[in-house]
Amino acid sequence: MKLIASNKKAYFDYEILETLEAGLALLGSEVKALRQTRVNLKDNFVKIIKGEAFLFGVHISYLDTIHAYYKPNERRERKLLLHKKQLLKWQIEASKERLSIVGLKLYFNQRNKAKIQIALVKGKKLHDKRQSLKEKALNKEILADLKHHFKG
């Protein structure tokens, strides 16, 4: 698995409940751009429209070598390739519990197919974000103390 891009902000802003791997319907020039890691997953989300899942907000820059006539929209919606049962299950869960679906990681699998790991998430409140920052700082301090204790 070759990691192309990761959405680190999603881990901070959301509580991740369930993850799933999905394929992407891409153009040839977009696949070439992915191989050069010219992608940004920062503010992406998944919307289910008429029984199909679409990924919005992913920015895939086109290559400099592309012809001026053929320049696809860098932020266009991209279709996700999922099984119908998985899609229906997630659609019901997301609408029932007011959850969101976001992309976490974009990568090439062993067969060189572009895949995205999507997650069913619940938004964190401000105090939850502060709590996770405190826990992170505390863990960092504990690790530093342990390292210092065993080193000297």
UniProtKB/Swiss-Prot annotation:
Q: Where in the cell is it found?
A: Cytoplasm
Name a single GO biological process.
trans-translation
Top-level taxon of the source organism: Bacteria
CDD domains cross-referenced by the UniProt entry: SmpB (cd09294)
- List the GO molecular function terms: RNA binding
Membrane-crossing ranges are: none
Kindly give the Gene3D superfamilies that the UniProt entry links to this protein: 2.40.280.10
Q: Which UniProt keywords apply?
A: Cytoplasm, RNA-binding
Q: Respond yes or no to whether keyword Cytoplasm is given for this record.
A: yes
One cellular component GO annotation, for this chain's record?
A: cytosol
Which family does the UniProt entry place this protein in?
Belongs to the SmpB family.
Q: Which PANTHER family match?
A: SSRA-BINDING PROTEIN (PTHR30308:SF2), TMRNA-BINDING COMPONENT OF TRANS-TRANSLATION TAGGING COMPLEX (PTHR30308)
**Which function does this protein serve?**
Required for rescue of stalled ribosomes mediated by trans-translation. Binds to transfer-messenger RNA (tmRNA), required for stable association of tmRNA with ribosomes. tmRNA and SmpB together mimic tRNA shape, replacing the anticodon stem-loop with SmpB. tmRNA is encoded by the ssrA gene; the 2 termini fold to resemble tRNA(Ala) and it encodes a 'tag peptide', a short internal open reading frame. During trans-translation Ala-aminoacylated tmRNA acts like a tRNA, entering the A-site of stalled ribosomes, displacing the stalled mRNA.
NCBIfam families on file: PRK05422.1, smpB
Q: What protein does this entry describe?
A: SsrA-binding protein
Its gene? Answer: smpB
